[in-house]
């Protein structure tokens, strides 16, 4: 983080860090144009899903499931190798191409609403259980 902060020490980039308060976090995400998650180790990031739901253009590494969540145009996926150099290339592009940034934000929001809401996940889990019950005979 400090290397990137030194490269982008101006008003174009706000280095916020962790925000525990949910209302503040939502307000920040709704104002943000880009959300960056440069994790080297990750599962499925709730912060990434929150940013996507807020309509931020999202950039994350392919650590854990984050790359899968952003695949297919819902965001930009980076390798966990050479994150700093990748961000040095990507951040100016996202800053200078507002149409691209806005479209990535729209695609991110669409993806999270299509696949990652609680009701969608409950429906999918119920479907899975139903499929399993129809296939497997019950033991006596």
Protein language model features and the residues they cover:
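Short alpha-helical segment that forms part of, or immediately flanks, the ligand-binding pocket
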Residues: 26, 45, 49-53, 67-68
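Nucleotide-activated donor-binding/catalytic signature segment of Leloir-type glycosyltransferases, i.e.
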Residues: 1-20
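Short alpha-helical donor nucleotide-sugar binding micro-motif in glycosyltransferases
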Residues: 27-32
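Aromatic "clamp/platform" in nucleotide-sugar-dependent glycosyltransferases that forms part
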Residues: 40
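A short, well-ordered alpha-helix in the C-terminal region of glycosyltransferases
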Residues: 100-115, 121-127
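Short hydrophobic beta-strand element within catalytic cores of glycosyltransferases
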Residues: 57-60
């Amino acid at each position: 983080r400090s290397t990137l902060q030194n490269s982008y020490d101006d008003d174009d980039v706000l280095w916020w860090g962790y925000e525990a308060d949910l209302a503040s976090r939502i307000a920040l995400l709704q104002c943000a144009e880009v959300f960056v998650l440069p994790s080297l180790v990750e599962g499925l990031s709730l912060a990434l899903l929150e940013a996507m739901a807020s309509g931020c253009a999202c950039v994350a590494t392919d650590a854990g499931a984050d790359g899968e969540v952003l695949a297919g145009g819902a965001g930009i996926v980076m390798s966990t190798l050479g994150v700093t150099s990748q961000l040095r290339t990507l951040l100016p592009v996202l800053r200078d191409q507002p149409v691209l940034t806005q479209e990535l934000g729209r695609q991110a929001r669409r993806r999270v609403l299509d696949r990652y809401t609680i009701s969608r996940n409950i429906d999918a889990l119920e479907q899975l259980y139903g499929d399993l019950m129809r296939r497997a005979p019950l033991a006596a």
